[in-house]
């Protein structure tokens, strides 16, 4: 059993919500005035907040790109027909937010502001320029149009004005002045009974992170960001909501199943875990208080692995040493990964078997219950694995979601076996060689050479034009 020591700073935030399921912080923070304009250039605030700025800038040290498709080629099949089958890297430092969304193959290679596969909403978690544009043009004005339209405007990396009311006099004095800079996030928090203005300071810390580290979808003709929390925040609640509005992100090109793509639901999974239930916030673990050279405490903005600052994070509550806790986390991660792979294997077979049934003449009515099972199985799998830290945030919930995903995938395959038999197909459906990312992409008919060549041309020609225009308009520091 994990032993926990409670220090004075955390006693109320750890115990009271456990027994009363309410916010531990009786004090309420007044809503800070919204800025008339949002200053998106992060460098502007370096003189006022030098330690925070330098530590934020140090997220550029988290530069390694890890190709998740190369690590696990099954993903290519599960996302067949969707840009994630082209390119999917694990997350890295906030300093690369704009660079990575520009350079990923998923955003395509648009030639002009009206070109490309994705909407403006794909910028929404990448830059304080998003808050600036929403403040300037309103949400409808911001969301309107294609992703490429925002290229010359959204140029500063995720930073100060995403989380802080930087125009506040209190911010200039060194106060945090947290704010929800995305109105759609504020509405979502209100919908689940957590209005930001009435939340305690520690609750607000996690809500600010929850603007982006969250599941969302693109709603309506304008493709505006919305959180699917109307029926609740658990995987089944969101699944029910999506089914009710008949939403899908794309149709899998093999099984022709209308699919859901989970994003990065850290807020939902953290809420379901032991830390969230005890109000141990994102900040406590990922942005601890540290000392500068003069011995002054400040919040470390080099957001990263809590084990990198063990004495200031885990050791505030846990009595075990670093090695012991790392072992626990590694074991949880391995358990989740083992079940993840088993679910993926079932889903890969289900997609190819569904394709075989369709090729054999299966009707829409015959396929509907099978496709529902595939949709629900992959959604539950995806919500578990898209939250990269679920082995730490909510390992029990991760295993539960993956377990139900396995059940749904098995149901789909059982129904497929029966359906295929009615079409005279009783032999095992052969799966092509998908042992590497490249072979898997070839199996679903992707011309990766062309896709990569078009992207390289875009990077060399279009992005420099965007940056030149941004500098002319004073949006980038010279």
Swiss-Prot record:
Binding site for Ca(2+): 215-216, 261, 263
Binding site for heme c 4: 282, 285-286, 393
InterPro entries for this protein: Cyt_c552, Cyt_c_NO2Rdtase_formate-dep, Multihaem_cyt_sf
Record's keyword terms, sorted: Calcium, Electron transport, Heme, Iron, Metal-binding, Oxidoreductase, Periplasm, Signal, Transport
Keyword Oxidoreductase: yes
EC numbers, comma separated: 1.7.2.2
Record-listed heme c 5 binding positions: 275, 314, 317-318
A GO-annotated cellular component: outer membrane-bounded periplasmic space
Cofactor(s) listed in the protein's UniProt record: Ca(2+); heme c
Cofactor annotation remark: Binds 1 Ca(2+) ion per monomer.
Any GO BP annotation: anaerobic electron transport chain
SUPFAM superfamilies found in the cross-reference section: Multiheme cytochromes
Binding locations of substrate: 216, 264
Source superkingdom: Bacteria
Binding site residues for heme c 3: 94, 209, 212-213
Chain sites annotated for binding heme c 2: 160, 163-164, 301
Signal peptide positions on this chain: 1-26
Primary location class: periplasm
Record's subcellular location: Periplasm
Disulfide bond residue pairs: none
Chemical reaction(s) catalysed: 6 Fe(III)-[cytochrome c] + NH4(+) + 2 H2O = 6 Fe(II)-[cytochrome c] + nitrite + 8 H(+)
Record HAMAP family: Cytochrom_C552 (MF_01182)
Annotated function: Catalyzes the reduction of nitrite to ammonia, consuming six electrons in the process.
Name of this protein: Cytochrome c-552
Organism of provenance: Escherichia coli O157:H7 (strain EC4115 / EHEC)
Gene (name only): nrfA
């Amino acid at each position: 059993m994990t032993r926990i020591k409670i220090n004075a700073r955390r006693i109320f935030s750890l115990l009271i919500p456990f027994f009363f399921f309410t916010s531990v912080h009786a004090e309420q923070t007044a809503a800070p005035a919204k800025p008339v304009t949002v200053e998106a250039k992060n460098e502007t605030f370096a003189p006022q907040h030098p330690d925070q700025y330098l530590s934020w800038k140090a997220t550029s040290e988290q530069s390694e790109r890890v190709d998740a498709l190369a690590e696990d080629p099954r993903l290519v099949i599960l996302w067949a027909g969707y840009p994630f089958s082209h390119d999917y890297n694990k997350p890295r430092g906030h300093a690369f937010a704009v660079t990575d969304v520009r350079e990923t193959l998923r955003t395509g290679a648009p030639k002009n502001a009206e070109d490309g596969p994705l909407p403006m909403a794909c910028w929404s978690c990448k830059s304080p320029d998003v808050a600036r544009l929403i403040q300037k043009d309103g949400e409808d004005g911001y969301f309107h149009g294609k992703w490429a339209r925002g290229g010359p405007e959204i140029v500063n990396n995720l930073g100060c004005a995403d989380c802080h009311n930087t125009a506040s006099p209190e911010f200039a004095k060194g106060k945090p002045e947290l704010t929800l800079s995305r109105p759609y996030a504020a509405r979502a928090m209100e919908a689940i009974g957590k209005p930001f203005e009435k939340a305690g300071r520690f609750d607000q810390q996690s809500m600010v992170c929850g603007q982006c580290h969250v599941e969302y979808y693109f709603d309506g003709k304008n493709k505006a960001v919305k959180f699917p929390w109307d029926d609740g925040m658990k995987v089944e609640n969101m699944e029910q909501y999506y089914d009710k509005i008949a939403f899908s992100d794309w149709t899998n090109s093999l099984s022709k199943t209308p699919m859901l793509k989970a994003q990065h639901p850290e807020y939902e999974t953290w809420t379901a875990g032991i830390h969230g239930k005890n109000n141990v916030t994102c900040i406590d673990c990922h942005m601890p208080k540290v000392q500068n050279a003069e011995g002054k405490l400040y919040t470390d903005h080099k957001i990263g692995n809590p084990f990198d600052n063990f004495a200031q994070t885990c050791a505030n509550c846990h009595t075990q040493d670093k090695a012991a806790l790392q072992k626990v986390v590694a074991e949880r991660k391995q358990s989740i990964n083992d079940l993840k792979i088993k679910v993926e294997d079932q889903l890969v077979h289900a997609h190819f078997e569904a394709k075989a049934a369709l090729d054999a003449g299966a009707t829409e009515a015959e396929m509907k219950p099978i496709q529902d099972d595939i949709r629900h199985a992959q959604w539950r799998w995806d919500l578990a694995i898209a939250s990269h830290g679920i082995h730490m945030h909510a390992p029990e919930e991760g295993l539960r979601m993956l377990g139900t995903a396995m059940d749904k995938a098995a149901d789909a395959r059982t129904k497929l076996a029966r359906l295929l038999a009615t079409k005279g197909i009783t032999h095992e459906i052969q799966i092509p060689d998908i042992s590497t990312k490249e072979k898997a992409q070839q199996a679903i008919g992707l011309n990766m050479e062309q896709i990569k060549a078009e992207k390289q041309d875009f990077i060399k020609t279009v992005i420099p034009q965007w940056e030149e225009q941004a500098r002319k308009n004073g949006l980038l520091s010279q």
